[in-house]
Structures are given as structure tokens and as C-alpha cells.
């Protein structure tokens, strides 16, 4: 007789995702291949999880959770079904070893990407095809994402209201984001702020719609490479440019 095929993997319950991440990574902190944990249920090891029911993959609620601060984690979670996820806030923040291909994730329901790859210095994967049409916050999304330099110029930013510190200290980032729709953005403070050693960003963003922006504080502080014509920007609502 042929061996009995393994049972289909059961979907992770939405309310259990954070607890299951903690339990699995306690056993297999780098890969998430928590075979002992998985032997006691029918969810499988982390790379094989069915996450189709999960809505909240955030890394911070009232405290660190999920992958937040999991500094050695570098598991292959690129096959996850994220089509129900609305919250990726701080999801991979301080996951300092993480550099896996997550470019195929379905992000069409995600509203919050605040700090998603904040302090993820190893990450440099192609994520340009993510559907960001519902995202309202990209603040501090790539802070200290020191290696990140991928084309995200086609992202839909029509609903984004905050880009505060989005690329702060992401000193290798230099991609064309000039066609982004920034018409709802109110906060661009610290957006391209660099360390004392400077940054690489020098792209034409002169056509950005800045009519709703109120805060541009330190927007280009230590952005040493930047030298583009932004003289046409509408700064009528800006109250802070220091």
C-alpha cells in the first residue's frame, strides 16, 4: 500500500496567530521549522502555515508580539496567504536577520504598514508588486532598513496620510518614487533624514502633490545626495520646515 498522504493543513485561527508564532519560534527561532510543536496539531511548521484567515500580523500591540524583535528569524514565509491581513504594523520590526522573498504576498486589504520593516537591516527583497491601495500609514516603514534599495515606484499611495520618517537612515535607498500620489499626505517630517554620513536618495520628486502637508520638519536633514528641483511644491499648509 502507498503511504497515507499527510492530512491537509488546517488554517491558523485568526486569534491564535501571535501565540502560535511565539510557540513555534521558541522551538525553532531561525527557520520556524518547529516540527515538535507541529506534531501536536494539524497546522504544520511555520513556512507551511495556512494563514488565509489571519487579519492581524502586527508586531506591536500593547507590547512586542509576532516577529517583532526576533533578531535571528529568517524563515521562508513567502508562500503565506496574506489576503485577509489588514494590519502589518511593525510586523518585521527589529527582525534584524530577516531577508526572505515576500514579494508575492497579497496585501490588498492591508491598511497599516507603519514600521513594517523598521530596523530590518538585512532586508532587500523585491516588493514592488505589493498592492498598497488601502494603506493609510507608511510612517517609519523603512527606518534603518540599511540594505533596502528596491523599486517601489509603482506602489499605490493614494490613501497614505503619513510618510513620517519613512526612509530615515535607509541610506542605500535611491529609487524613482516620483510618480507616487501624495495628495493625502499630511506628514513628511524626517522622511529622507540620514545619518551624519549621508544618504543616497536623489530622485525627481518635484511633481509630488504636497498641498495637504503640514509638517516637513527635518525632511531632508543629512540627505546629502539630494539635489532636485522641488520649487514647485505647494507648501501653503506647512507649519514646520525647520
Predicted regions, residues:
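Negatively charged
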Residues: 4-242
Amino acid at each position: 500500500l502507498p503511504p497515507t498522504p499527510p492530512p491537509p493543513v488546517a488554517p491558523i485561527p485568526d486569534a491564535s496567530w501571535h501565540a502560535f508564532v511565539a510557540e513555534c519560534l521558541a522551538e525553532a527561532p531561525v527557520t520556524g521549522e518547529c516540527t515538535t510543536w507541529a506534531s501536536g496539531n494539524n497546522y504544520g511548521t511555520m513556512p507551511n502555515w495556512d494563514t488565509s484567515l489571519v487579519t492581524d500580523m502586527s508586531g506591536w500591540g500593547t507590547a512586542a508580539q509576532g516577529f517583532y524583535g526576533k533578531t535571528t528569524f529568517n524563515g521562508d514565509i513567502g508562500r503565506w496567504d496574506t489576503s485577509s491581513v489588514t494590519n502589518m504594523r511593525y510586523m518585521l520590526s527589529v527582525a534584524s536577520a530577516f531577508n526572505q522573498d515576500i514579494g508575492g504576498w497579497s496585501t490588498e486589504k492591508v491598511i497599516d504598514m507603519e514600521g513594517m520593516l523598521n530596523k530590518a537591516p538585512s532586508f532587500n527583497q523585491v516588493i514592488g508588486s505589493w498592492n498598497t491601495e488601502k494603506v493609510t500609514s507608511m510612517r517609519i516603514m523603512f527606518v534603518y532598513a540599511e540594505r533596502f534599495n528596491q523599486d517601489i515606484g509603482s506602489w499605490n499611495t493614494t490613501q497614505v496620510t503619513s510618510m513620517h520618517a519613512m526612509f530615515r537612515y535607509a541610506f542605500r535607498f535611491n529609487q524613482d518614487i516620483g510618480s507616487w500620489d501624495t495628495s493625502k499626505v499630511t506628514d513628511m517630517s524626517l522622511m529622507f533624514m540620514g545619518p551624519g554620513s549621508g544618504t543616497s536618495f536623489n530622485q525627481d520628486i518635484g511633481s509630488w502633490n504636497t498641498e495637504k502637508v503640514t509638517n516637513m520638519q527635518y525632511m531632508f536633514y543629512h540627505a546629502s545626495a539630494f539635489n532636485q528641483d522641488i520649487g514647485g511644491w505647494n507648501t501653503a499648509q506647512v507649519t514646520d520646515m525647520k
